[in-house]
Regions:
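Hydrophobic alpha-helical connector segments
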Residues: 67, 81-106
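Short hydrophobic/aromatic patch on the recognition helix
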Residues: 48-58
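Short, hydrophobic secondary-structure boundary micro-motifs
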Residues: 39, 110-116, 149, 153-154, ...
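C-terminal peripheral helix-coil segments that are non-catalytic and often amphipathic
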Residues: 1-7, 134-135, 139-150, 172-202
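Basic, helix-initiating cap at the start of DNA-binding domains
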Residues: 1-46, 63-66
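Short secondary-structure transition hinges
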Residues: 95, 101-136, 165-173
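Amphipathic, non-transmembrane alpha-helical scaffold segments
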Residues: 16, 69, 73, 126-134
Length: 202
């Protein structure tokens, strides 16, 4: 019977972790470029691993999609924690909003499958990620509102819906990034303090 030393075990675990990260990176890129129907063999090949390695980490396509989606949410959350310390909360919010667009460029290729999973047995997973995303948006909005840069009647759910609306109508495969970012800037300008508030919200 072969005995694996502690150092060898650590090396194997580190190698497995690197493979997982690489698979997620390649899946993220290919989902954005081709959609969720992308061949899993192509993803494994791009990551430089065998298909068996992919299935060990992600037994089903749904598992891989969820992992990519979760990684994007975590990245947006982490970015909000970095940006919240900025001396310019308004510009920090704008930068986070632009990062949200990049996230949606990936998610758009997975929308149909994600919606199916949201309504099925994976719905609990999405409640957690939705809460994480809303907390990140609130984290970015609060200091900007407190600094008098952003209107006080803006709420995180509304911001997320506005950004989501932009992204769902801006397919990264056919819409120039500059056009999408221009729309994000228009939304940001509408959020700024001093912008007109509709009569229904006064």
């Amino acid at each position: 019977m072969t005995t694996v030393s502690r150092d060898e075990g650590k090396a194997l675990r580190a190698d497995a972790a690197r493979n997982r990260v690489r698979l997620l990176e390649c899946a993220t890129t290919l989902f954005a470029e081709r959609g969720v129907e992308t061949s899993l063999d192509d993803i494994a090949r791009a990551a430089g691993v065998g298909i068996g390695t992919l299935y060990r980490h992600f037994p089903t396509r749904e598992d891989l999609v969820l992992a990519v989606y979760g990684a994007q949410i975590e990245a947006l959350d982490e970015r909000s924690r970095e940006l919240v310390a900025s001396d310019d909360p308004g510009e920090a919010l704008r930068e986070w909003m632009r990062g949200f667009v990049d996230f949606y460029a990936v998610k758009q290729g997975m929308v149909t499958l994600l919606r199916t999973m949201m309504a099925g047995s994976r719905s609990e997973h999405f409640e957690h990620t939705r809460a994480t995303l809303q907390q990140a948006a609130e984290r970015m909005l609060s200091p900007a509102v407190a600094a008098g840069v952003i209107r006080q009647d803006v709420a995180a759910p509304e911001l997320l819906r506005a950004l989501g609306g932009i992204c769902l109508t801006s397919d990264p495969r056919t819409t120039p990034a500059s056009s999408t970012l221009a729309l994000v800037d228009l939304v940001y300008d509408g959020l700024r303090f001093g912008a007109p508030v509709s009569a229904s919200r006064r």
